[in-house]
Amino acid sequence: MIRNAKSFAIGLVLLLSFALCYIGMMSPNFGNGRNGLNYADDMFNSFSKGSSNFIKESTKIAQSQNGTNINLTIKASSAADAVKWGKLYTGAGATVTIKDSALTINGDFGRILNSVVTDSESMYNNDGKVVEKRYGYDPREAINNWNNSFKKIDSALKTKSQFKEEAALAKVVQKALEPGYNYYGVEIKKVSDNKSSLAFLLSFYLLYTVWYGFGLYYLFSGLGITVTKPKKKAEV
């Protein structure tokens, strides 16, 4: 039962307008079939990409391993994957022997890491065709194969107590390989060049949250549903 018609009307108007705004946000009218949430997500991904370029740092880490030889055997999930993994390491100048799904890799660890950084930089710059031309198959799959094979190499290096090499590997994965893969296809945008867009998105998010909250508040207030502190019982 409505207790306060004015409060109820305000709440109803706020919630109905909120619903209309939500429908508009979820419509695919924000370019390339995106809705408002997709647009905002892409915008923030572009901003974060602009501050996630660690290629120079990764190159220094890779170069610190130049002249360090590794000779180890890892196992892929299938013989077909082993062949694809092998293309990565032969491209980095290593000698690779494949037997079924097992690969024995013998080569300069610095050159291997430098190849990974080079591929990651190409992906970060949305130039996947270069990586595809280098190995002859999908660039995302190639980067994923680097990552999967590195997990095996990481375990092998730990087993051999080559902890310095393992640490360098982990840093290159974190600072080059992962950003290259995750941000592939994302446009780079700097916050300094898009201050107005960022301010609008943050302000709208705040307004949208308050908008919904006040709508509920006035609606329930109009229905007589309020939150009050319980009265203290008088002591006898």
Segments predicted by a language model, with ranges:
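Soluble, non-membrane globular domain cores that form compact, hydrophobic packing
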Residues: 12-24, 161, 187-188, 207, ...
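Hydrophobic secretory-pathway targeting helix
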Residues: 1-39
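Early extracytoplasmic/domain-onset interaction patches
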Residues: 22, 39-44, 50-76
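Long, solvent-exposed extracytoplasmic domains/loops
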Residues: 60-172
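Alpha-helical transmembrane signal-anchor/signal-peptide segments
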Residues: 26-56, 189-194
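Juxtamembrane interface at the cytosolic side of transmembrane helices
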Residues: 1-8, 192-236
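Short, aromatic-rich amphipathic segments at membrane interfaces
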Residues: 171-207
